[in-house]
Amino acid sequence: MTWNKAPAADAEAGGGGDTGHARLRELGYKQELKRDLSVLSNFAFSFSIISVLTGITTLYNTGLSFGGPATMTFGWFVAGAFTMTVGLSMAEICSSFPTSGGLYYWSARLSGKRWAPFASWITGWFNIVGQWAVTTSVDFSLAQLIQVIILLSTGGNNGGGYMASKYVVIAFHAAILLSHAAINSLPITWLSFFGQFAAAWNMLGVFVLMIAVPTVATERASAKFVFTHFNTENNAGIHSNFYIFVLGLLMSQYTLTGYDASAHMTEETKNADRNGPIGIISAIGISIIVGWGYILGITFAVKDIPYLLNPENDAGGYAIAEVFYLAFKSRYGSGIGGIICLGIVAVAIYFCGMSSVTSNSRMAYAFSRDGAMPLSSVWHKVNKHEVPINAVWLSALISLCMALPSLGSLVAFQAMVSIATIGLYVAYALPILFRVTLARKHFVPGPFNLGRCGVAVGWAAVLWVATITVLFSLPVSYPVTKDTLNYTPVAVGGLFLLVLSSWLLSARHWFKGPITNLDG
């Protein structure tokens, strides 16, 4: 892993000596967005989207069901280590091509002239749909958490508490998205402030919860339980320990997504060819550390796994909510402290969704700038504050529409949000695959590069994505029925067929890949 010094001529070429601005001109693009983000702000957007409080909290049930403490404790590092290989490879490419288009632009440049249009088309659509799915799942998760907070605040499941209907939950989701679109319509200086505040909230929130919850709990699990207990009682008909461990990894892998935000924010980041890669790598690394601490802290307050997963408990089967609630109720006779803890998580999830919309809109802006989206001329326009305002509201609207299937079936909704993990990682892997194959000999690294390790790290990243794509498509319950079928391969396969057919029937005749907009 090395850092190359940028040529002086490049560093001085426009943009007040900013190397990212100079590199953007070399790539053929005008500076249309306000370049005002520091390396800290760039990191903050990715760290806030990864948001360990969001991913671990919302999928803690999955971790408990499939393997329990042992899977979560050690599986977190398995997923984290391989995620870092993906992040390192992406950071190396980002350093060479610091544009808002990110992944799809990289695929075009790395696959060669013959394959560039098709490669960027496939990568771009998997990336943007995956991002929309992330925003959908994050904000819907917040709506569901609000539902649980209201339930516990009004007496709990066993005390006559109010359980909001699915229509109320979707209304919460719509209101959250509306507020996120409004915030993302503000100038980038405001978003920079919110992003840094969100990162600080996530960091402090983890430390508060990992210390407070097990400290308050009157009964705590032993270290042996936290590090070695392997739960096989999943009520899913699955008995293979390896299979159970694999399914338990979903919590970790779902959490460790969204760090492509640092790449999509590069046209607004100072010296992006250096600071973009730093944002990606540091967001993953710090998330791995604080996420493990959060898992340990909460799991030390776990005693009775079947009860936590039981829909008849006070939190309606929402495991972490029940852990928080019981910890305070057992000591103080009231669970209000646990509800406040859930409020800390809710704020973190809110900021996660906010940053997701920011990343979505920059991707939509870049993709439409290259003519890949319907009504492209509308979506890549920027307002007087140099914000892609139309792309912001488009992203919010699509994320709302993607949540509507939840009104008919949560199974259908889960199929759609599965794209958030697998679909997005496919988009991550494609430019890395082109980097280690078609572009292996002619790739020109930027200031950050992996040196001789680049190809090996890249292959490790590609193989990991291929592995999780297969593993997370396996059945999660036996016997398999229409209600228990894992619809991930259906959703991801359906997206691939839709993108491929649109290419064959139409786009191949007019889409030529990324186009420059620099006059002269």
From Swiss-Prot:
Membrane-crossing residue ranges in chain numbering: 39-59, 74-94, 118-138, 168-188, 193-213, 236-256, 278-298, 334-354, 387-407, 410-430, 454-474, 487-507
GO molecular function terms attached to this record: gamma-aminobutyric acid transmembrane transporter activity; L-alanine transmembrane transporter activity; L-glutamate transmembrane transporter activity; L-lysine transmembrane transporter activity
Keyword Cell cycle part of the UniProt annotation: no
GO cellular component terms listed in the entry, alphabetical order: membrane
Membrane topology recorded in Swiss-Prot or TrEMBL: Multi-pass membrane protein
Keywords recorded for this protein, A-Z: Amino-acid transport, Membrane, Transmembrane, Transmembrane helix, Transport
Compartment list: Membrane
Biological processes per GO annotation: gamma-aminobutyric acid transport
Function according to Swiss-Prot or TrEMBL: May be involved in the transport of amino acids.
PANTHER family according to UniProt: AMINO-ACID PERMEASE BAT1
NCBIfam families linked to this entry: 2A0304
This protein's name: Amino-acid permease BAT1 homolog
Source organism of the structure: Oryza sativa subsp. japonica
